[in-house]
């Protein structure tokens, strides 16, 4: 089938909820923030949770519902991971924006337009500790005229003095049912055909990240047209074919290092990312049948975790996959080895 005509707008933006009440699967957060919008007086806020669950969407929706399109640009400052947010930026750009007072007479019909500004710091957990400490003083000094919205995946990376000054909102991972409903809505709007198997595959490979699922869907549509299959989605997602990972695990179960080494050579030759191999191998091991004991699973998973850390640190992928293969063989053969 010929590819369907597509606009240049990313579907992530096209189908981003414009109001807080439209955010999916975050009922408690939506209920509290809806009450906040009615009073038009919000505290500093900290949104945390897995990626693709609606944190940024919620922050933007609050700002738009408070100020409307006309005042939004002058009242809201957005900074994300692509911006320099070191200590110098906190002391200059953020402080300068926070310090400017706003009058209550600048109102837009239909919007509360409270007399404060909002600074949205996306991926705040990537800010240095020095920058966060500098930001604490800015929050204290200009709290009457500026509200801060922090967005992060890991709340543990936000220093306590900042976190304690914010109302915290935890965003739950999206269930497969919620993701499926949203994906089907987009398919209906775009005239796409997506069968049950493809829908299940999309939910699985996106791992609860709705933003990622929508991106995969749009990419598959551009490449393969309006009828999308599971294979199409696997091709655009970068997921390693299951048979490739199964072959590696089967080779390790054989106890023959030469066979396992050959499978590692094939994986490297095909250019599959080692980190993705590790993730999928973990799932296979965790779901393995009763011929593998819990202790063997624990040893293999520990090795996979250590390998994943080394890959993040820049270790050679070929050597790390060989280490995984040999360690898995040892664990499955119950050879004495210190893991």
Swiss-Prot record:
GO cellular component: nucleus
Family per similarity comment: Belongs to the activator 1 small subunits family.
Task performed by this protein: May be involved in DNA replication and thus regulate cell proliferation.
Organism, as annotated: Arabidopsis thaliana
Localization terms from the record: Nucleus
SUPFAM superfamilies according to UniProt: P-loop containing nucleoside triphosphate hydrolases, post-AAA+ oligomerization domain-like
Molecular functions (GO terms): ATP binding; ATP hydrolysis activity; DNA binding
One protein family per Pfam: AAA
Transmembrane segments: none
Protein's UniProt name: Replication factor C subunit 4
InterPro entries xref list: AAA+_ATPase, ATPase_AAA_core, DNA_pol3_clamp-load_cplx_C, DNA_Rep/Repair_Clamp_Loader, P-loop_NTPase, Rep_factorC_C, RFC_lid
């Amino acid at each position: 089938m010929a590819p369907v005509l597509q606009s240049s707008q990313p579907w992530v933006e096209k189908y981003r909820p414009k109001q807080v009440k439209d955010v999916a699967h975050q009922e408690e957060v939506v209920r509290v923030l809806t009450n906040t919008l009615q009073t038009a007086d919000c505290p500093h806020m900290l949104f945390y949770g897995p990626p693709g669950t609606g944190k940024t969407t919620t922050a933007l929706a609050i700002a738009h519902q408070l100020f409307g399109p006309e005042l939004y640009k002058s009242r809201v400052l957005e900074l994300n991971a692509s911006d320099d947010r070191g200590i110098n930026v906190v002391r200059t750009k953020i402080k300068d924006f926070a310090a400017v007072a706003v009058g209550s007479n600048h109102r837009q019909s239909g919007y509360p337009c409270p007399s404060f500004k909002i600074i949205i710091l996306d991926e705040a957990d990537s800010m240095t500790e020095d920058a966060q400490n500098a930001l604490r003083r800015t929050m204290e000094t200009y709290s009457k005229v500026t509200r801060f919205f922090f967005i992060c995946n890991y709340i543990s990376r936000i220093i306590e003095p900042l976190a304690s000054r914010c109302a915290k909102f935890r965003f739950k991972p999206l269930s497969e049912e919620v993701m499926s409903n949203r994906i089907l809505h987009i398919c209906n709007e775009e005239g796409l055909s997506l069968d049950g198997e493809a829908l299940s595959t999309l939910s699985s490979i996106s791992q609860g990240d709705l933003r990622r699922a929508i991106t995969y869907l749009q990419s598959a549509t551009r490449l393969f047209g309006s009828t999308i299959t599971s294979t199409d989605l696997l091709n655009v997602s970068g997921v390693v074919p299951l048979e490739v990972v199964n072959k590696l695990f089967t080779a390790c179960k054989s106890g023959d290092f030469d066979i396992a080494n050959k499978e590692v050579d094939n994986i490297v030759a095909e250019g599959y990312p080692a980190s993705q191999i590790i993730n999928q191998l973990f799932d296979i091991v965790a779901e393995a049948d009763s011929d593998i004991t819990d202790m063997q699973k624990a040893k293999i998973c520990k090795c996979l975790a250590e390998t994943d850390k080394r890959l993040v640190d820049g270790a050679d992928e070929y050597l790390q996959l060989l280490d995984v293969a040999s360690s898995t063989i040892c664990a499955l053969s119950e050879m004495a080895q210190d893991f």
